[in-house]
């Protein structure tokens, strides 16, 4: 009996010790995340390899940007608190930043969820953005997020990630340049129902993380997929803010996105190099004073302003996205070369050719006129920047206006009756190279700027530019006024007017110093308004250089 009593006492003591040890372990597990130390039991349960590893419990770094869709589980939103949520589905972007905690297998998560196409078009408030935080239990691939209370995080991990992510930074850049201005965005946010949602709703997201392999750019990349459910129970009553919706998003390969931006800058560099070659060809085509005077200074100035804007845009993008600075700075440098060296030099030569020459003027007069030219050019440059900022919502019509740079040359050809001012290669080459950037931005469905493509606008731009180039080519081959009715044209001086056939004497051409036989065909000689006679070929070649009479230096009308 004594042995049985001792055995019962020992058994009861061992059972009590086991219960006390179990309660102690449970209490230890209820400590805060940041204060709980790693235990031997945790390492045994979740495995010692938290980073890397190929086992079933290997940690996945889910920090990144995810793009996908959202959809209401019901046909329509059944909430009466926010009836503006009328659309059934739309696009979404999820930004997540994770950091390890002292509990093995649990990561702290911060981020934001952006819902596009939430409201009707009549509200025009853009996407709804919600800041979230929670935990990621990586052994079970479970993600739990709730709406952030709005207080600033101590770690700053989310801000550091967004400031170093080229996808996020270039999205901000393109939204300010091509989509909406900061002032409009702030006004939309003030009137957005999203603020009421943050006040009256609790956002809860439960998601599962899965892994998939993508072979983009000839390389296998691990991509993560988020599939989950988002619910929004109300704070003050039992009515939900909106119906439950499903989330489905896939991680973005930042390396592929980076390569897209680099390829774009290579395209801009190549296009700029082609434009330099075309400008050199055109400058050789109009290397005389008469040839340069036929070119419209407004046409060259408009192209120079366009290239200066592109230089500033690429330089700003390179400064904003530090990891892409070298690529964008190279593109900006080539645009600066096109603008400052070649186009400005050509603009000055045109200005000098069209400027009336007076014999008694001094250097002060020329310097004053040159400074006036530069002040007008840079005044238009700065004024254009202010106008584009003010009328930011009308960027596409403004681009159509900027891409009408051939129209001043067409009008100048008709007014002056100029003969072949531009080389055909320059017309075709500039038309094609100028279309490269807008067609990429507004036509490529997967451009790195994330601008919504518009096929109709791209077709309109190509047709508009093609029409201008076609008119210039018609003027080149069939005459500057070939499409203008003769009734509307002023009377034109004829260099092939009839001579007095009773005059049977020969005259000398002062250009080639040979005799002109007036008894031959009338088309073999040309007569100026000042009654001087020259060979037709000699005077035409002379007028390609100077529009002055070789004998008396009087101005000559266009032929």
From Swiss-Prot:
Listed pathway(s): Protein modification; protein ubiquitination
GO CC list: endomembrane system; membrane
Reactions catalysed, as given in the entry: S-ubiquitinyl-[E2 ubiquitin-conjugating enzyme]-L-cysteine + [acceptor protein]-L-lysine = [E2 ubiquitin-conjugating enzyme]-L-cysteine + N(6)-ubiquitinyl-[acceptor protein]-L-lysine
EC identifiers of the protein: 2.3.2.27
Database matches in CDD domains: RING-H2_TUL1-like
Cellular compartments annotated: Endomembrane system
ZnF segments: RING-type: 509-553
PROSITE patterns to which the protein is assigned, alphabetical: ZF_RING_2
Tissue expression per record: Highly expressed in stems. Expressed in root xylem and seed coat.
Group of enzyme by EC: transferase
Residue spans, topological domain Lumenal: 30-259, 316-318, 392-394, 445-458
Gene3D superfamilies referenced in this protein's UniProt entry, alphabetically: Zinc/RING finger domain, C3HC4 (zinc finger)
Regions of this protein lying in the Cytoplasmic compartment: 281-294, 340-370, 416-423, 480-559
GO MF entry, a single one: zinc ion binding
Keywords: Membrane, Metal-binding, Signal, Transferase, Transmembrane, Transmembrane helix, Ubl conjugation pathway, Zinc, Zinc-finger
Any one GO BP annotation for this protein: protein ubiquitination
Chain segments annotated as coiled-coil in the UniProt record: none
Signal peptide positions on this chain: 1-29
Knocked-out gene: effects: No visible phenotype under normal growth conditions.
Residues passing through the membrane, by range: 260-280, 295-315, 319-339, 371-391, 395-415, 424-444, 459-479
Membrane topology: Multi-pass membrane protein
Function: E3 ubiquitin-protein ligase that may be involved in xylem development.
UniProt comment concerning the protein's domains: The RING-type zinc finger domain is required for E3 ligase activity.
Name this protein carries in UniProt: Transmembrane E3 ubiquitin-protein ligase FLY2
Organism of derivation: Arabidopsis thaliana (Mouse-ear cress)
Encoding gene (name): FLY2
């Amino acid at each position: 009996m004594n042995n049985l009593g001792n055995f019962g006492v020992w058994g009861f003591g061992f059972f009590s010790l086991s219960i006390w040890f179990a309660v102690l372990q449970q209490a230890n597990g209820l400590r805060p995340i940041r204060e709980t130390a790693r235990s031997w039991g945790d390492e045994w349960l979740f495995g010692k390899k938290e980073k890397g590893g190929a086992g079933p419990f290997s940690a996945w770094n889910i920090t990144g940007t995810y793009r996908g869709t959202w959809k209401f589980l019901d046909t329509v939103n059944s909430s009466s608190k926010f009836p503006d949520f009328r659309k059934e589905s739309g696009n979404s972007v999820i930004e997540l930043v994770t950091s390890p905690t002292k509990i093995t297998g649990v990561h702290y998560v911060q981020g934001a969820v952006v819902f596009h196409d939430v409201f009707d078009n009549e509200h025009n408030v853009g996407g709804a953005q919600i800041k979230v935080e929670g935990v990621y239990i990586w052994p079970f691939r479970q993600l739990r997020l709730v709406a952030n209370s709005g207080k600033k995080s101590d770690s700053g991990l989310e801000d550091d990630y967004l400031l170093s992510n080229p996808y996020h930074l270039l999205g901000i850049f393109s939204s300010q340049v091509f989509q909406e201005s900061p002032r409009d965005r702030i006004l939309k946010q003030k009137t957005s129902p999203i603020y009421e949602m943050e006040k009256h709703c609790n956002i809860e997201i439960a998601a599962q993380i899965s892994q998939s392999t993508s072979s983009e750019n000839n390389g296998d990349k691990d991509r993560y997929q988020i599939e989950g459910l988002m619910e929004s129970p109300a704070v003050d009553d039992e009515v939900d803010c909106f119906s439950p919706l499903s989330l489905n998003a896939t991680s973005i390969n930042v390396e592929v996105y980076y390569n897209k931006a680099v390829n774009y800058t290579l395209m801009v560099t190549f296009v700029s190099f082609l434009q330099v070659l075309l400008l050199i060809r055109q400058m050789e085509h109009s290397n005389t004073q008469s040839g340069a005077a036929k070119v419209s200074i407004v046409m060259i100035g408009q192209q120079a302003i366009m290239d200066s804007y592109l230089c500033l845009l690429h330089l700003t993008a390179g400064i904003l996205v530090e990891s892409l600075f070298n690529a964008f700075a190279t593109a900006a440098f080539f645009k600066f070369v096109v603008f400052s060296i070649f186009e400005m030099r050509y603009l000055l030569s045109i200005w000098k050719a069209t400027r009336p020459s007076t014999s008694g003027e001094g250097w002060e007069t020329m310097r004053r006129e040159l400074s006036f030219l530069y002040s007008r050019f840079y005044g238009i440059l700065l004024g254009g920047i202010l106008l584009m900022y003010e009328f930011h919502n009308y960027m596409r019509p403004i681009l159509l206006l900027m891409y009408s740079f051939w129209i001043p040359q067409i009008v100048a050809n008709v007014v002056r009756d100029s003969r072949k001012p531009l080389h055909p290669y320059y017309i075709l080459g500039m038309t094609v190279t100028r279309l490269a950037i807008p067609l990429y931005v507004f036509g490529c469905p997967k451009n790195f700027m994330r601008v919504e493509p518009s096929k109709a606008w791209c077709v309109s731009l190509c047709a508009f530019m093609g029409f201008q180039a076609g008119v210039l080519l018609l003027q080149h081959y069939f005459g500057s006024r070939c499409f203008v009715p003769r009734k509307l044209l002023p009377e034109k001086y004829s260099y092939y007017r009839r001579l007095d056939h009773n005059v049977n004497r020969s005259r000398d051409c002062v250009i080639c110093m040979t005799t002109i036989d007036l008894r031959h065909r009338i088309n073999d000689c040309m007569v100026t308004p000042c009654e001087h006679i020259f060979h037709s070929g000699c005077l035409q070649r002379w007028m390609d250089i100077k529009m002055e009479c070789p004998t008396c230096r009087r101005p000559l009308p266009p032929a």
